[in-house]
Amino acid sequence: MKNKIFLIGMPGCGKSTIGEIIAKELMLKFIDMDICIEEKTSKTISELFEQGEDYFRDIESETCKEIIKYDNVVIATGGGVVKKDINIETLKNNGLVIFIDRPVEKIISDIDVSRRPLLKNGKERIIGLYKERYDIYKKACHKIVVNGSTIDEVVGEIKKIIINN
């Protein structure tokens, strides 16, 4: 079993919720990268984005380098972590990267856009991001798991992947 599991995917695909459950069930530590960034900077993700997306992405890259030092951990990354090739390389070279692929219609029906700075323009923005990032997520991962059913089924599928790697 790999001792670092990185969950990637669109905002609202279930990375944090699923990651927490998997970590608990496999007795691993859980880290939400966005929370790490907020604690490190004493600012919310939205406040950081107000200083520009490039500014935020630089902090995200620094955080990527820092979190790979942890062992026996499940890490829910930020949805845009794959926008920088250096982050993809860092994640892929240091653990098992799983893309949680959730149908965009389900993301739209569930997501709270007020907490997601890049999604505040609503449905069209989410669809645009999905189209922009989908192939990048596929390239950035070792395994793809579709989150189109229940959380229990997705958790079970990811746990099998983790245990068999």
Curated annotation (Swiss-Prot):
Report the principal subcellular site.
cytoplasm
Recorded catalytic reaction(s): these are: shikimate + ATP = 3-phosphoshikimate + ADP + H(+)
Q: Which Pfam families match?
A: SKI
Spell out the subcellular localization from the entry: Cytoplasm
Alphabetized InterPro entries for the sequence = P-loop_NTPase (IPR027417), Shikimate/glucono_kinase (IPR031322), Shikimate_kinase/TSH1 (IPR000623)
One GO CC term, this protein: cytosol
Which cofactors does this gene product need?
A: Mg(2+)
Residue positions annotated to bind Mg(2+) are S16
Q: What class of enzyme is it?
A: transferase
Q: Name one GO biological process term.
A: chorismate biosynthetic process
Q: How is the cofactor bound?
A: Binds 1 Mg(2+) ion per subunit.
Disulfide connectivity? none
Q: Where does substrate bind?
A: D34, R57, G79, R133
- Where ATP is bound, by residue? G12, C13, G14, K15, S16, T17, R116
Q: Which GO terms describe its molecular function?
A: ATP binding; magnesium ion binding; shikimate kinase activity
Keywords of the record, alphabetical order, are: Amino-acid biosynthesis, Aromatic amino acid biosynthesis, ATP-binding, Cytoplasm, Kinase, Magnesium, Metal-binding, Nucleotide-binding, Transferase
Q: Which Gene3D superfamilies does its entry note? A: P-loop containing nucleotide triphosphate hydrolases (3.40.50.300)
Annotated pathway, please? Metabolic intermediate biosynthesis; chorismate biosynthesis; chorismate from D-erythrose 4-phosphate and phosphoenolpyruvate: step 5/7
**Quaternary assembly:** Monomer.
**Similarity section:** Belongs to the shikimate kinase family.
Matches recorded under HAMAP family: Shikimate_kinase (MF_00109)
Indicate what this protein is called per its UniProt record.
Shikimate kinase
